[in-house]
Amino acid sequence: MAAQVVPVLSKLFDDYQKTTSSKLKIIDAYMTYILFTGIFQFIYCLLVGTFPFNSFLSGFISTVTSFVLASCLRMQVNQENRSEFTAVSTERAFADFIFANLILHLVVVNFLG
């Protein structure tokens, strides 16, 4: 089983390196960072506790929402999806991402109290 998985993962990684643009790689790195931050927060919640609950909840909601916003940005910036997002330029997608993140973090800071 493991002998079959290694070549598949190797080919997947090689194709990703060759065909993915640098913009998408940066977005993917950001999404990976957010994913690990959310996992770390959840493990911390399980091991230590949720006191104060507002802080945990706002931090976890922030990571999940940031991941969703980044995935939306990735879909809009990807050249393979140009036919789906003809009215949205790359700059407009990035501006929407920044604006949505600004609103998100204003809500998160407000929720903290």
Curated annotation (Swiss-Prot):
Pathway linked to the protein: Protein modification; protein glycosylation
GO process terms (BP): apoptotic process; negative regulation of apoptotic process; protein N-linked glycosylation
Topology of the protein relative to the lipid bilayer: Multi-pass membrane protein
Subcellular location(s) of the protein: Endoplasmic reticulum membrane
Keywords in alphabetical order: Apoptosis, Endoplasmic reticulum, Membrane, Transmembrane, Transmembrane helix
A GO term from the CC aspect: oligosaccharyltransferase complex
Cytoplasmic side: 1-32, 79-92
Domain of life: Eukaryota
Alphabetized InterPro entries for the sequence: DAD/Ost2 (IPR003038)
TM helices/strands, residue ranges: 33-53, 56-78, 93-113
Effect of gene knockout: RNAi-mediated knock-down is mostly embryonic lethal. Embryogenesis proceeds more slowly and embryos are osmo-sensitive.
Presence of keyword Lipid metabolism: no
Membrane topology, Lumenal segments: 54-55
Keyword Transmembrane among record annotations: yes
Subunit structure: Component of the oligosaccharyltransferase (OST) complex.
Functional description taken from the UniProt entry: Subunit of the oligosaccharyl transferase (OST) complex that catalyzes the initial transfer of a defined glycan (Glc(3)Man(9)GlcNAc(2) in eukaryotes) from the lipid carrier dolichol-pyrophosphate to an asparagine residue within an Asn-X-Ser/Thr consensus motif in nascent polypeptide chains, the first step in protein N-glycosylation. N-glycosylation occurs cotranslationally and the complex associates with the Sec61 complex at the channel-forming translocon complex that mediates protein translocation across the endoplasmic reticulum (ER). All subunits are required for a maximal enzyme activity.
Name this polypeptide is given: Dolichyl-diphosphooligosaccharide--protein glycosyltransferase subunit dad-1
Organism: Caenorhabditis elegans
Lineage: Eukaryota, Metazoa, Ecdysozoa, Nematoda, Chromadorea
